[in-house]
Amino acid sequence: MQLQDSIFIVTGGASGLGEATVRAFHGAGAKVVIADVGVAKGEALAAELGEGVAFCKTDITSEAEAQAAVDLAVSRFGGLHGLINCAGVGPAWKMIGKDGPHPLDAFARTVNINLVGAFNMIRLAAVAMARGEPNAEGERGVIINTASIAAFEGQIGQAAYAASKAGVAAMALPMARELARYGIRVNTIAPGLFLTPMMEALPQDVQDALGKATPFPPRLGRPAEFAAMARSIVENVMVNAELIRLDGAVRLAGK
């Protein structure tokens, strides 16, 4: 699938990996709906990029708001060819903290946003994609989810986050198998240590140390590199049901 004139929804598209993806895809000629809870940033980005970009306030755990994002893509741009799921949260809670056990509601919230929210967007977007006309390869759509290397090497305090991202990674294959009949691919990117807003909030010396933990290149990943990987997946029809670690060969040891 070529990006030119294709229509995408990017969740979490107002900042970080999502914003980089919106910018890259729009720059390549795609039409993009930014689906994000951050209204000010989302509207500002849509205004900056102009024609071919729309913002939709979207809590991905809400059936109504997720459907509204899909409906906006169809009504504003004429259909839907792709979904890039970047929205998520990354809290840290120890199993046994100074105030007691890991809060159950914190675990549930993390899984609800990162896993259930991603699933919610996929199930609704897939219906819209399946209604579209296939291209010459018989392809109607492509879905890319964002997992994390924490799904495989979760650190202390990441039980909820790791569980949610492992679920994201695990659902790609059964989804890809089921949606193959409609010409819809499903893939997953598992980023390593990237310079996202959450990372930028850390002191510079901490950022530098984390970057040096990556074998090569010995630095934090750039959001534009995530966007480039997403574009590569979109444009290569043979990439399906894959999980790609985008991590510079880092393997996090337990601490």
Regions found by a protein language model. Give the residues of each.
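Canonical Rossmann dinucleotide-binding motif of NAD(H)/NADP(H)-dependent dehydrogenases/reductases
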Residues: 3-33
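Residue(s) in the substrate-gating loop at a strand-loop-helix junction
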Residues: 148
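Catalytic Tyr-X3-Lys loop
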Residues: 89, 100-120, 144, 168
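Active-site helix of classical SDR
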Residues: 122, 164, 172
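C-terminal substrate-recognition "lid" of short-chain dehydrogenase/reductases
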Residues: 2, 222-246, 251
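The beta1-alpha1 cofactor-binding region of Rossmann-like NAD(H)/NADP(H)-dependent oxidoreductases
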Residues: 39-40, 58-68, 104
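Conserved mid-core segment of classical short-chain dehydrogenase/reductases
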Residues: 90-108, 127, 131-137, 157-160, ...
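Alpha-helical segment proximal to the catalytic Tyr-Lys
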Residues: 127, 176-178
